């Protein structure tokens, strides 16, 4: 059995995967949302520890605030003993890891400023007494987690987990990591790219018409570097794309799959449904009719309606299921995201079904369930 919890994380990602049999689970945590999610992140670690189970992989996909900050705030709240018992591996690409592992494959500029040193825990917890925050590396050292860190992840690698589960990485590539190490950009929460914020005019158009609109390409070095992977357990396959670029994921898929396409049971849309992080080629290659969207709508910036139109365009005769952890289509757009024609052609006919996740299980396939809250677990 696999349980997926796509937890509300404001504009970010915060995903918990539990897999196992007979109510005994292994766990994967993927990102931790914004800093407001820190308490819940800590609570989940405590729940797993109380069950005497393990976090096989804590994946921090990349440096952006809306993915990493809640995880770091949560780690701060948990005792070293619990973390030592519970967390087995942390996957996060750092400058030091990139430099150490890839310096022979491309020109990596020497820098006195490491990316990871710019990531700080903002809150002033008593056990540290640090006013300006504690650096990422220092946090791992003080929490006894430094030796659990896998700090250079590239596509083609694989993590073998207990009970026959695997994580096969499809992003980033070596070239992208080297570029990221040399050109990384500090994430500004309120300063997004123009194409990321161009959704308002598009929602006035019909989905059928938007199928002719082109998808864009994300130029951010930060979003060339996120960790993306395929999780497999028995017959269940899940694709978690973080904020990864589709062109990089396509290269990664070629590293793990010889066929021209790859079937999965669920795909977490990259970058919260941004127009710049999905492509027709990706949708044709990683095939599914079940999509997960993690966003609160982020001030009407995501998801791009063009992306939804292309999900439908590439679906063929299949109906599309879109699982959401916020009802952004109502709250952000006052129920005007979909036009009358959209509702007639796609919503009413169930060609596009939207599901708002809560603590009740929705079955994706036999043995695989998705939630938006974890309740009593």
Where are these regions (language model features)?
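Extended hydrophobic/aromatic segments used for targeting, binding, or gating
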Residues: 27, 239-309, 313
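Active-site metal-binding motif and surrounding structural segment of the metallo-beta-lactamase
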Residues: 25-26, 39-91, 258-276, 285-292
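Hydrophobic/aromatic beta-strand patches that form the interior of the parallel beta-sheet core
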Residues: 5-7, 28, 59, 91, ...
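Conserved beta-strand hairpin/beta-sheet module of binuclear metal-dependent hydrolase folds
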Residues: 1-51, 221-247
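A short acidic (Asp/Glu
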Residues: 16-17, 67-73, 101-103, 250-253, ...
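C-terminal regulatory/interaction regions
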Residues: 2, 10-13, 254-261, 285, ...
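Flexible, acidic/histidine-containing loops and adjacent segments that form or flank the divalent-metal
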Residues: 78-237, 320-325, 337-377
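Active-site environment of divalent metal-dependent phosphoester hydrolases
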Residues: 11-13, 35-36, 63-68, 97, ...
């Amino acid at each position: 059995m696999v349980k997926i919890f796509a937890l509300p994380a404001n504009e970010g990602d915060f995903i918990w995967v539990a897999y196992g049999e007979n109510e005994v689970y292994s766990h994967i945590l993927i990102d931790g949302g914004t800093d407001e999610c820190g308490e819940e992140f800590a609570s989940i670690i405590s729940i797993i520890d109380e069950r005497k189970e393990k976090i096989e992989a804590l994946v921090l996909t990349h440096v952006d605030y809306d993915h990493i900050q809640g995880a770091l705030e949560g780690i701060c709240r948990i005792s070293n003993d619990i973390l030592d018992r519970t967390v087995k591996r942390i996957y996060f690409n750092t400058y030091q890891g990139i430099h150490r592992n890839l310096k022979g494959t491309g020109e990596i500029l020497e820098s006195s400023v490491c990316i990871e040193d710019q990531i700080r825990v903002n809150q002033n917890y008593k056990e540290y007494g640090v006013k300006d925050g504690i650096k990422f590396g220092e946090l791992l050292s003080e929490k006894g987690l430094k030796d659990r860190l896998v700090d250079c992840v590239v596509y083609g690698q694989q993590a073998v987990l207990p009970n026959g589960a695997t994580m096969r990485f499809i992003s980033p590539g070596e070239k992208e990591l080297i570029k990221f190490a040399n050109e990384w950009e500090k994430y500004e929460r309120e300063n997004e790219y123009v194409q990321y914020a161009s959704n308002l005019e598009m929602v006035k158009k019909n989905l059928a018409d938007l199928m002719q609109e082109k998808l864009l390409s994300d130029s951010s070095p930060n979003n060339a570097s996120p960790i993306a992977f395929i999780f497999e357990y028995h017959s269940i396959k899940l694709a978690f794309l973080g904020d990864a670029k589709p062109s990089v994921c396509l290269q990664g898929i070629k590293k793990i799959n010889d066929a021209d396409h790859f079937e999965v049971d669920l795909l977490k849309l990259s970058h919260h449904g941004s127009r710049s992080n999905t492509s027709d080629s990706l949708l044709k290659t990683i095939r599914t009719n079940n999509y997960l969207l993690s966003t609160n709508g982020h001030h009407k910036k995501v998801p791009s309606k063009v992306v939804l139109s292309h999900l439908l365009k590439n679906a063929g005769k299949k109906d599309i299921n879109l699982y959401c952890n916020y009802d952004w289509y109502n709250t952000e757009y006052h129920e005007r995201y979909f036009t009358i024609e959209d509702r007639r052609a796609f919503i009413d006919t169930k060609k596009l079904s939207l599901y708002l996740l809560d603590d009740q299980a929705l079955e994706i396939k036999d043995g695989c369930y998705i939630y938006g809250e974890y309740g009593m677990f």
